[in-house]
Amino acid sequence: YILLDCPAGIEQGFMNAIAGADRAIIVTTPEVSAIRDADRIIGLLNSNQLKKMELIINRIRMDMVKRGDMMTVDDVTEILSIPLIGALPDDEQVVIGTNQGEPVIGLDSKAGMAYMNICKRIMGMDVPFMELQGSTGFFSKLSGLFKKD
């Protein structure tokens, strides 16, 4: 595997790097500017005939999703229209583990479990997605249509 962390400004180096790629995993956060950048990357990959693209959504904060201040996983996947292989909650245990030099995968945390599941999906295993949506799922949205202000 070759991993590229690409800035928003796509240059010739990016185009050279993807020339031999047969698969791309786009990692984004659920913020409007990041989604725009990811969409631009997807467009460039499509125009270069790279068809196998997958999505990881990073740093999801459920408190913000519940307040309506952050896009949901479903919102992001609907906008970008590529298969999701993982969603990572914004987990303070990641910061603590990183500061202590502990591997995130080994942490007993939601993020650690999400990372492990993503690794398994990359390797072709079929593993279920963790529930991150909380009360913002389908039935919650449906019931929200009937609430009076």
Labelled PLM ranges:
Residues 1-96:
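Conserved catalytic-core segment of NTP-binding enzymes
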Residues 33, 71, 110-113, 117:
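Generic recognition of short, well-ordered alpha-helical interface segments
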Residues 68-70, 107, 132:
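Hydrophobic transmembrane signal anchors and adjacent membrane-proximal interface regions, especially
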Residues 83, 93, 113, 117-149:
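P-loop NTP-binding site
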Residues 98-115:
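C-terminal boundary of histidine-terminating zinc-finger modules
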